[in-house]
Amino acid sequence: MSFPKELEKVLEITKAQNVWRRTQTLNLIASENVMSPLAESVYMSDFMSRYAEGKPYKRYYQGTKYTDEIETLAMDLMNEITNSKDCDLRPTSGTIANAAVFRVLAEPGDKALIAPVQAGAHVSHTKFGTLGALGIQHIEMPFDEENINVDVDKAIKMIEEVKPKFVVLGGSLYLFPHPTKELAPHVHAVGAKLVYDAAHVYGLIEGKVWSSPLKEGADIMTVSTHKTFPGPQGGAIFSDGSEVFKQVSRTIFPWFVSNHHLHRLPATAVTAIEMKYFGESYANQITRNSKALAEALAERGFKVIGENLGYTKSHQVAVDVRQFGGGNKIAKLLEDANIIVNKNLLPYDKPENVSDPSGLRIGVQEMTRYGMKESEMEEIAELFKKVIIDKKDVNKVKKEVIDMRKNFLEVKYTFDDMKDLEKYSSKSLKLII
């Protein structure tokens, strides 16, 4: 029997996606990354067909002995590279991780202080997202415009006056670290907890180019496992032995997660092993690339945010493109040239401008994993200039992008061949390859 037309269409769309995004585009979305072929190989396993409610060795289903093993191993590996004591991999996203933490720390009507939206607070921290859905009142801490960050002195005063149930740091437009160490003592002095959303910078934390929030006073840290940490899409929660973690871990199931998408677990474990051996060099190259791209864009006439601070300390670069038509127009124009970024609110934008903000948010972590370095950041900046400033034919620029990608199709910061793999992996892993 030949394939029905509907099936042919599904296969055609999937193939087109794989060819386009894996081989023909510059993927510069700050919240995305790519797994290694090794991680992808264990992702496609029988685990994706199975259920396992509850914690390892305390399940509500039978048939979970290997799930218990791989989940425990993955948590141990994640704790090792994070230098933490507690890890829970059951949240299926960073937002679910946040929801589980927020719900334990506050009741409807309680108050939470968050980093200013101008300083990059994620939507889940706000009344428009998870906090609002839980009925928790969000109050933004004061913004320091010059440093694109929380205003520490004013925030301390607000913490003392408001006495919130918890304070959230971390963000989605996240160029510079939020002041964890400076605020933690004042948060704890009023009996509150400090939550750090490290979704975007987790790979930089375990790669030791970004300070560990848990070592600076955060009570609990939520992360995504697919941004600067290049694993499968999912979430995780970490702590250094806090009572809050125990409470959250007791309630993730059944409040927010039933089955937790078990095929993530071996892929997360593999990525943790990769980052154990290659994570520091990867994180260092990410930050060198983001700085190089920011400088190259500025040299070509773009208004790059944070010039007085060195532009960025993360994987992200933020660019004001109002003079060229705004973020919405320019993001679409770049996509026509196979350069994939997202429009983004900048610190001085009003929230109601979310559909057509001033800026672009650019992330270098995925193209870094494909092996790009500082010289390629210069080339990328030149491609931006051709599309946006020089107004070159986007189809001609698109051809340049495709030609450029031909040299960057192989995932780096992983085990290159079977000889490398044999040094570090068990016999069971070898059988999968």
From Swiss-Prot:
Keywords: Amino-acid biosynthesis, Cytoplasm, One-carbon metabolism, Pyridoxal phosphate, Transferase
Residues bound to (6S)-5,6,7,8-tetrahydrofolate: 121-123, 243
Co-factor requirement: pyridoxal 5'-phosphate
Enzyme Commission number(s): 2.1.2.-
Signal peptide annotation: none
Family the UniProt entry places it in: Belongs to the SHMT family.
Primary role: Catalyzes the reversible interconversion of serine and glycine with a modified folate serving as the one-carbon carrier. Also exhibits a pteridine-independent aldolase activity toward beta-hydroxyamino acids, producing glycine and aldehydes, via a retro-aldol mechanism.
Subunit record text: Homodimer.
NCBIfam families in the cross-refs: PRK00011.1 (NF000586)
Name of the featured protein: Serine hydroxymethyltransferase
Organism annotation: Saccharolobus islandicus (strain M.14.25 / Kamchatka #1) (Sulfolobus islandicus)
Lineage start: Archaea, Thermoproteota, Thermoprotei, Sulfolobales, Sulfolobaceae
Gene: glyA
